[in-house]
A protein has these predicted regions:
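Bacterial N-terminal signal peptides
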Residues: 7-16
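N-proximal helix/coil linker or "cap" segments that precede and/or mark the start of modular domains
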Residues: 18-48
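A short beta-strand-turn-helix
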Residues: 41-67
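Aromatic-flanked redox-active Cys/Sec active sites in thiol-based oxidoreductases
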Residues: 70-76
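Structural microenvironment flanking redox-active thiols in thiol-disulfide oxidoreductases
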Residues: 80-121, 134-138
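Short, internal strand/loop/helix patches
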Residues: 117-150
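Thiol-/selenol-based redox modules, centered on thioredoxin-like
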Residues: 149-180
Length: 180
């Protein structure tokens, strides 16, 4: 009986310590963003009347080496986990030269989205909203009328060239955001 208990304990310990830790899912770049991000215009979440364009993103790259556009929705459980990781490591991510822009996709109730971000302590981060999916369609992440598979993160350099497209965040997600 002791051997069975020990074997069960060892089995549970082995699998719960990250021995099989998953890496982030790296995805191929859609044709629309292989060279550079196309022009776009969406709205900032803090104020529905404030535009956020490719020019605003370019200004962020004057201060940072990279910008990570972290796509999310309030109903997406893996997105919640990814945002929590980013919030917990935000200072280190920014110190490593990466700015974070949270991109809400497909939701029109901005109050609900703001409340969601406040609960995650992410309400001070730059957050934009793409309620009609124009940004995701323009970037080739989905075809017109389709829903985006979340989570997604696009990392761009100073010239707005896409460095990586990430699907599900893994144990290496923060290191990827930091350019490591």
């Amino acid at each position: 009986m002791k051997k069975l208990f020990f074997a069960l304990f060892a089995f549970v310990t082995f699998f719960s310590t990250g021995a099989f830790a998953a890496d982030s899912q790296k995805l191929p770049l859609p044709t629309a963003i292989k060279d550079s991000l196309p022009w776009f215009a969406v709205r900032e979440l803090k104020d529905d009347n404030t535009p956020f364009t490719r020019g605003h993103l370019a200004r962020l790259t004057q201060k940072y080496d990279r910008v990570a556009m972290v796509y999310f929705a309030t109903w997406c459980i893996p997105c919640r986990a990814g945002i929590k990781q980013v919030v917990a490591q935000q200072a280190e991510i920014e110190k490593a030269g990466t700015a974070i822009v949270l991109v809400n996709v497909g939701e029109r109730e901005t109050t609900k989205v703001r409340d969601f971000l406040a609960k995650l302590s992410a309400d001070k981060m730059v957050s934009i909203t793409d309620p009609y999916g124009r940004l995701t369609e323009g970037f080739g992440l989905v075809k017109e009328g389709q829903n985006i598979s979340l989570p997604r993160t696009i990392i761009v350099n100073k010239s707005l060239k896409v460095l990586q497209l990430i699907g599900e965040e893994g144990d290496d997600y923060i290191k990827i955001l930091m350019g490591q």
